[in-house]
Amino acid sequence: MPRQRSPLFVLFLTVFIDLIGFGIVIPILPLYAEHFHASPIAIGWLTGIYSGMQIIFTPILGKLSDRFGRRPVLFVSIVGTAIGFALMGLAHGLPLLFAARILAGITGGNIAIPQAYIADVTAPEKRSRAMGLIGAAFGLGFTFGPLIGGLMSRISYSAPFYFSAGLAVINAVLVYLILPESLSREQRARPHERASMVEVFRHGRGAMFAIVLGTYFFLIVGFSIMTTLFALFTERRFGYDAQANGYMFGFVGIVSVIVQGGLIGRLIKMFGEVALARTGMILTTISLALLPMSNSLAFLLLVSAGLAAGSGFASPPLSGLASQMVEANWQGRALGILQSAGSTARLLGPLLGGWLLTFDMQKPIAQYGYTPFLAGAFLCLIGAIFAFCFKKPAKDRSTEDIAVGV
């Protein structure tokens, strides 16, 4: 298959549409669950169970894509996502809503497949910039998705879920008709190979892969604490309502798109993946520590931009480095393990952040949010320390010298 830009463009559209559907659900799901008399604890589990399923099934889907090809596994998983969204819209109680979230979490583990596809069709020195396209799709999806969801909720609580199901159907058709397969039969892993973490480490640079994994995990734990509590923080500190918080999340999404979709290639060319990952971890740590000190809109916007830029600087290089730590036909499994670490972090971060916030509930407004956000900053600092233990792969040396934006 010729290595050209069109598959990456189709892949970008695939992830973008997928993330719009996911983003639509974000502002609606808690209110939808309350409609069924869900307690706060039940809502927490309803949110976390999605990531819990991703923890289990992301590496499995990565293995299946290594064995059977990226395109068919991506197609089937997107169809499953459409069914999950439709079931959410049809739900008349919590049992079916939980079942739908479980299905959505299982099929939502497919994010490793686009990353593995990129690893298949790009040279190592251009890989992190291409990974930035995935980050840009995330940013756009999280920018427009919640806004669309908020607007559609005026029709009914179930309308956004039906709309998301329709988007997933369009996405499945797009993958089936347009996206070419990136793996030849010779490149696909043999049936007897297993996707255990130990074997992935054995088929690459195990120690460095573990360090990349740890860095990514702490980044996502800290960042997910922020995303979970941001609306509660701004509501109490500034009196922001859902619409105002939607604008704030939109701003964060725009910054993410600019960084991961436009700047990442040039920055990797100038500084290299390792240096950029370290810079992103430090910037995220500082921004999280400054967030509870926000006392004006200008300061809040500045800190929010720092958080978006920091995670945008760190995440694509970490994905690119992880793919370079293993042999070619193990990249899907390696990236699947990386995304499972992210899913674990997205499960633990909200639970940890919510628990830590209880210590601030009786404090003055000026002190509200310090405990969870400073804890998140500390966790990101641990990740930054991990990042300073990186040793570049020999083949990665060119990332500082070769133009990756071309």
Predicted regions and their residues:
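Juxtamembrane intracellular "pre-TM" segments in multi-pass secondary transporters
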Residues: 1-5, 180-214, 237, 405-406
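Multi-pass alpha-helical transporter architecture, strongest
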Residues: 174-178, 374-406
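Cytoplasmic helix-loop-helix junction between adjacent transmembrane helices
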Residues: 100-139
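A membrane-interface helix-boundary motif in multi-pass transporters
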Residues: 153-166, 355-379
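Conserved MFS/SLC helix-loop-helix module at the cytosolic interface between two early adjacent transmembrane helices
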Residues: 55-94
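Helix-to-loop junctions at the C-terminal end of transmembrane segments
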Residues: 58-69, 259-273, 357
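Short amphipathic helix-loop junctions that connect adjacent transmembrane helices
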Residues: 27-41, 228-244
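C-terminal transmembrane helical hairpin of 12-TM major facilitator-type secondary transporters
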Residues: 274-318
